[in-house]
Amino acid sequence: MSRNLIYRRNRALCFVLILFCFPYRFGARNTPEAEQSTAKATQIIHVSNSTWHDFSRLVDVQIGSHVSGVSELKRYLHRFGYVNDGSEIFSDVFDGPLESAISLYQENLGLPITGRLDTSTVTLMSLPRCGVSDTHMTINNDFLHTTAHYTYFNGKPKWNRDTLTYAISKTHKLDYLTSEDVKTVFRRAFSQWSSVIPVSFEEVDDFTTADLKIGFYAGDHGDGLPFDGVLGTLAHAFAPENGRLHLDAAETWIVDDDLKGSSEVAVDLESVATHEIGHLLGLGHSSQESAVMYPSLRPRTKKVDLTVDDVAGVLKLYGPNPKLRLDSLTQSEDSIKNGTVSHRFLSGNFIGYVLLVVGLILFL
């Protein structure tokens, strides 16, 4: 038997084994399981997002309707890449292009694809989120496409060196957070990614020469992506090798784990930092709600542990860290307690993890 044939046979066998060990990961998007996985999104959020229009009045609005607020919805979808209109002047008519945009939004956010403004869709649109567009991304289209939810920036840009320096701005900062607190948060966030890929991150003082530049900015800060106030877009970062990571200074950022006792509009800095570092590395948004790279994040929510989807996406770009530990891969067991999302190890599926890692390496 030829070496090439053996290789292809082993790839196929590995894929079958992964299917066997992770059957629930391979369902189509529009299934009862998918609807169950997004059930949390149907809970109307209690915190009003004053930055964006009150979309709640648009629930169940039908195509052909003329309703005040639809123009704001179109502007929102335009902001995140779903509506292409150079004039940026939108009507209040629920038309065909809007229905198509809603369907694409639902697909990208892991919702049942209906094209309708159901409660789960409208609620998700009201949540604070990352400012990076959901579209203009490259979808993973390899043999494992049916299992993957991660995306990349167009062209799949990546860094071509194994050590990246980063610096936190000493001028664009927050008065109520100490420099050391912010640095500690980012050290933890960077370590999440460096633990799974052969890239290390070195903190430096020189902001101008650092590969990755981090700072807090308010409003229009000159990069073409102005921030919009409390609980709108939380942050954004640029594809490699741009290196800029900007956080909205208008947010109430917290760096401890006292989420329950914090303000109703508090945002966990480490959760957002971990997400944005994924963008710095070249990852786009994931349609899997449990993933760190999912675009939306509820206030007072902590989500910092990389899921299998996050890890699979970044491994396809950089390959595995030689020191990658199997038990560092987390499979989400989303349990929302007191406003926090907890990600726990699946202790009962160790063999599945072994096969998954082997499969990822074979497909790299």
Curated annotation (Swiss-Prot):
Protein name per its UniProtKB record: Metalloendoproteinase 1-MMP
Activity's dependence on pH = Optimum pH is 7-8.
**Would the keyword Ribonucleoprotein be found if you checked this record's keyword annotation?**
no
Family listed: Belongs to the peptidase M10A family. Matrix metalloproteinases (MMPs) subfamily.
Could you tell me the membrane topology recorded for this protein? Lipid-anchor; GPI-anchor
Active site: which residues?
E276
What this protein is reported to do is described as: Matrix metalloproteinases (MMPs) or matrixins may play a role in the degradation and remodeling of the extracellular matrix (ECM) during development or in response to stresses. Can cleave myelin basic protein as well as fluorigenic peptide substrates, McaPLANvaDpaAR-NH(2) and McaPChaGNvaHADpa-NH(2) 4-fold more efficiently than McaPLGLDpaAR-NH(2) (QF24). Active on myelin basic protein (MBP) and, to some extent, on McaPLGLDpaAR-NH(2) (QF24) and beta-casein.
| Cited InterPro entries | M10A_MMP, MetalloPept_cat_dom_sf, Pept_M10_metallopeptidase, Pept_M10A, Peptidase_Metallo, Peptidoglycan-bd-like, PGBD-like_sf
Q: How does the cofactor bind to this protein, according to its record? A: Binds 2 Zn(2+) ions per subunit.
Which residues are listed for Zn(2+) 2 binding in this entry?
Answer: C130, H275, H279, H285
Please report, in chain numbering, the residue ranges of the motif Cysteine switch. 128-135
Key words of the record: Cell membrane, Glycoprotein, GPI-anchor, Hydrolase, Lipoprotein, Membrane, Metal-binding, Metalloprotease, Protease, Signal, Zinc, Zymogen
Where in the cell? Cell membrane
- Please summarize the temperature-related behavior of the activity in one or two sentences: Optimum temperature is 45-55 degrees Celsius.
Where is lipid attached as GPI-anchor amidated glycine? G339
Indicate whether tRNA-binding appears among the record's keywords.
no
Q: Where does Ca(2+) 2 bind?
A: D211, G243
Q: Which gene encodes it?
A: 1MMP
- Look up the EC number in the record and give it: 3.4.24.-
Q: Name one GO cellular component term.
A: side of membrane
- SMART domains linked: ZnMc (SM00235)
Q: Which domain of life is it from?
A: Eukaryota
**PROSITE patterns listed in its UniProt record:** ZINC_PROTEASE
Name any cofactors this protein relies on.
Ca(2+); Zn(2+)
Residues that coordinate or bind Zn(2+) 1: H221, D223, H236, H246
Provide the binding site for Ca(2+) 1.
Answer: D228, G229, D248, E251
